[in-house]
A protein has these predicted regions:
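Small-residue-rich helix-interface/hinge motifs
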Residues: 27-87
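"A position-specific structural signal for the A-helix of alpha-solenoid helical repeats
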Residues: 215, 253-254, 258, 285-296, ...
Length: 371
C-alpha cells in the first residue's frame, strides 16, 4: 500500500538494492519487534510501580516453589508476575493490562512528534511512519477482547472482565490469592472456601479455568473431600489444550495417584502415568507416584518403606514455606498410610476368622450328616 505513494515509489526505484531490502524487509521486521518490546516494557513498568515483580523463570525446575505445585504465576505475554500485596488487586491488574497498549500508543506519538520529519528523506520518513504505525496497530489489536489459540486472554479481554468485575474477574482474583497462599505455605485446608467457589464458578475451559480447577482439586483432596476432588480433577483434565505444559503432566500424575490411592486401581494408575512425558517428573514426584502404585498393588509395606526416600527428596529442595507445606502434607500422608495399613490388617484378620469359622461350621455339618 505504501509503495503506491508516488514519492515513496520513486525513492524506492532510485534506491540501491541494499536500501530496498532495508526499507521493505528489515524496517517492518524491526517495527514488529519494537511494538512487542514496547508493550512488554509498558507492562513491566506498570507492574513494578504497582507493587508487582517479575517472578523467576523455572530454570531449576525441581527447586522453584511454583514447581512443587505446578502452579505458574500470573503471566502477561511471556512475563510471570507475582505480588505479596493483595490489596486493591483488581484495580492494579487493570492498570497493568492497560500499561502495555498505552506504552505502544505513547511511543508512536512520541516518535511522530519528537521532531519535524518533513525535512528528512522519503526513506527516513517511511521508516519512522512504519515503526509508529506498527506500534499503533499492535496496541489497538491487543485491546481487542479475544482469547488466543491456547485459551489465553488478550489485554483487551482482561480489561473487559476486570472493568465489568464479572465471574471471570472474580476467578482471576481468587486464583491469584490461592497461588499466593500456596507459595506462603498456607495449608489448602485453611483457604477461604469462597476462593474455591469463585474460582470454579465459570468453567469456560480457558487457561484460568484449568489452573483454578487444579487449585480447587488440591483444596478438596487435602480436606479428604473425594467427591469434589474427583469432579475438579476430571474437569481440569477435560481441557488439555488450555492446560499449561507443566500442569498437564502434573494433572496426569495426580490422576494416576488418585486412581492408585483412592480407588486402589493400579491398572488405571499405570494408564495415566504412561501419558506423562518422559523426564518431566522430578525426584519427589516420581517417588510419590511409586508409593501410590505400590499401595494400589497391595504392597503396603513396600509403599511405607518408600516414605523415607520421599522425605529425603523433599529435604533436597531449598528451604521455603512451600517446601515446609509439602513436608507437612507428606507427614499427613504417612499417618494416613499407617491408619489404612491397620485397617487392612484388621480386615485381613477378620476375613481369616470368617473363613476359619465357615470351615469349622462346614466340618460340623459334615460330621452331623455322617452320624
Amino acid at each position: 500500500m505504501l509503495t503506491a505513494l508516488p514519492h515513496l515509489r520513486e525513492a524506492l526505484v532510485s534506491a540501491s538494492p541494499s536500501q530496498q531490502i532495508v526499507a521493505l524487509l528489515v524496517v517492518p521486521a524491526l517495527a514488529v519487534i519494537s511494538a512487542w518490546l514496547i508493550q512488554q516494557i509498558g507492562h513491566i513498568v506498570a507492574a513494578l510501580l504497582l507493587g508487582f515483580r517479575v517472578a523467576p523463570f523455572n530454570t531449576a525446575r525441581d527447586c522453584d516453589p511454583h514447581r512443587q505445585y505446578a502452579c505458574d504465576p500470573l503471566r502477561i505475554s511471556i512475563l510471570p508476575l507475582e505480588t505479596r500485596n493483595m490489596y486493591h488487586l483488581r484495580r492494579r491488574l487493570t492498570l497493568i493490562f492497560l500499561g502495555g497498549p498505552l506504552a505502544g500508543l505513547a511511543f508512536a506519538l512520541l516518535l511522530e512528534f519528537c521532531r519535524d520529519w518533513s525535512q528528512a528523506s522519503v526513506l527516513i520518513q517511511m521508516r519512522v511512519h512504519t515503526v509508529a504505525a506498527f506500534n499503533v496497530l499492535a496496541s489497538l489489536a491487543s485491546l481487542l477482547p479475544e482469547t488466543g489459540h491456547r485459551a489465553d486472554f488478550s489485554d483487551g479481554a482482561r480489561l473487559v472482565m476486570l472493568l465489568k468485575n464479572d465471574s471471570r474477574a472474580a476467578r482471576l482474583l481468587a486464583l491469584l490469592r490461592m497461588q499466593r497462599a500456596l507459595k506462603d505455605g498456607v495449608h489448602p485446608r485453611e483457604w477461604d472456601p469462597a476462593w474455591v467457589e469463585r474460582a470454579t464458578a465459570d468453567n469456560d475451559q480457558s487457561r484460568d479455568a484449568v489452573i483454578s480447577l487444579w487449585l480447587a482439586y488440591i483444596w478438596a483432596s487435602e480436606r479428604q473431600d473425594i467427591t469434589s476432588a474427583t469432579r475438579y480433577l476430571e474437569d481440569a483434565l477435560a481441557a488439555p489444550d488450555a492446560c499449561p505444559r507443566g500442569l498437564r503432566d502434573r494433572l496426569y500424575l495426580e490422576a494416576a495417584i488418585f486412581q492408585a490411592w483412592f480407588r486402589d486401581n493400579p491398572s488405571n494408575a499405570h494408564s495415566w502415568a504412561a501419558l506423562i512425558h518422559s523426564g518431566r517428573l522430578v525426584s519427589f514426584e516420581q517417588k510419590r507416584l511409586t508409593m501410590a502404585v505400590l499401595w494400589a498393588e497391595g504392597k503396603s509395606f513396600d509403599a511405607f518403606e518408600k516414605l523415607s526416600d520421599y522425605f529425603a527428596a523433599l529435604r533436597e529442595l531449598p528451604e521455603s514455606p512451600a517446601r515446609a507445606l509439602a513436608e507437612k502434607s507428606a507427614l499427613e500422608w504417612k499417618h494416613q498410610i499407617q491408619s489404612r495399613m491397620l485397617t487392612r490388617a484388621w480386615r485381613s484378620m477378620y476375613n481369616m476368622s470368617q473363613q476359619v469359622e465357615a470351615s469349622a461350621t462346614a466340618g460340623t455339618l459334615v460330621s452331623s450328616h455322617g452320624n
